[in-house]
C-alpha cells in the first residue's frame, strides 16, 4: 500500500483561538500506540481540555482524549493518558522559556496526519479576558456586515 501523502485534518481546536492570544506555533510528532492511530484515522479525538507541559525536560500533551478503538481487544489504550510530544531539545527549551512567564501556556491548536504520521500543532498562548473576547466578536460582526454591504452594492 502506498504511503499517504499530504495533510489530513483530524481535529481543529477553534476554541483555542477564541480563548487565547496565540503567538509562537510549532509542529510536534506524537508517540502513540497502534490502536490510538487507528482511532485517529476514524476521526475520533477531543482537544477541548488539552494542554501541553514541559516535565523533566520532555514535552507532554495532557488532556487529549482519544476514545478506545472499536475493533480493539483487551490491549486497547487508555483514552486519557498523557502523550509524549516529539520535539527537538532546542524547541522544548524555547517553548519552556516562553511558558515560564506568568500567564502563558502551551495549547494544541490542530491534530492532523502529515505523510501518514500524526502531528500536533502546539502554540504558545496567553489567556484572553472577557472584554477581549467581546471585542473580537464585535470586530468580526462588523467586518461581516461591511462585506455584506459591499456585496449588495455590486
What are these regions (language model features)?
Residues 69-71, 119, 130-132:
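Switch/connector loops and helix/strand junctions flanking conserved nucleotide-binding motifs
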Residues 16-47, 52-56, 65:
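N-terminal first-folded block
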Residues 86-123, 127-129:
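Beta-rich strand-turn-strand
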Residues 53-95:
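Helix-adjacent hinge/juxtasegments
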Residues 80, 87-92, 126-154:
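C-terminal end-helix/capping segment
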Residues 1-33, 141-154:
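Intrinsically disordered, Lys/Arg-rich N-terminal extensions and targeting peptides
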Amino acid at each position: 500500500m502506498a504511503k499517504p501523502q499530504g495533510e489530513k485534518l483530524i481535529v481543529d481546536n477553534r476554541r483555542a483561538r477564541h480563548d487565547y492570544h496565540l503567538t509562537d506555533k510549532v509542529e510536534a510528532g506524537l508517540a502513540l500506540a497502534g490502536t490510538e492511530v487507528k482511532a485517529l484515522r476514524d476521526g475520533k479525538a477531543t482537544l477541548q481540555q488539552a494542554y501541553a507541559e514541559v516535565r523533566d525536560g520532555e514535552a507532554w500533551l495532557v488532556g487529549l482524549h482519544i476514545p478506545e478503538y472499536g475493533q480493539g481487544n483487551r490491549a486497547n489504550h487508555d483514552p486519557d493518558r498523557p502523550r509524549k510530544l516529539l520535539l527537538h531539545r532546542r524547541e522544548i527549551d524555547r517553548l519552556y522559556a516562553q511558558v515560564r512567564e506568568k500567564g502563558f501556556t502551551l495549547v494544541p491548536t490542530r491534530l492532523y496526519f502529515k505523510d501518514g504520521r500524526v502531528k500536533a500543532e502546539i502554540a504558545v498562548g496567553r489567556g484572553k479576558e472577557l472584554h477581549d473576547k467581546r471585542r473580537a466578536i464585535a470586530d468580526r460582526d462588523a467586518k461581516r456586515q461591511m462585506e455584506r454591504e459591499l456585496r449588495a452594492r455590486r
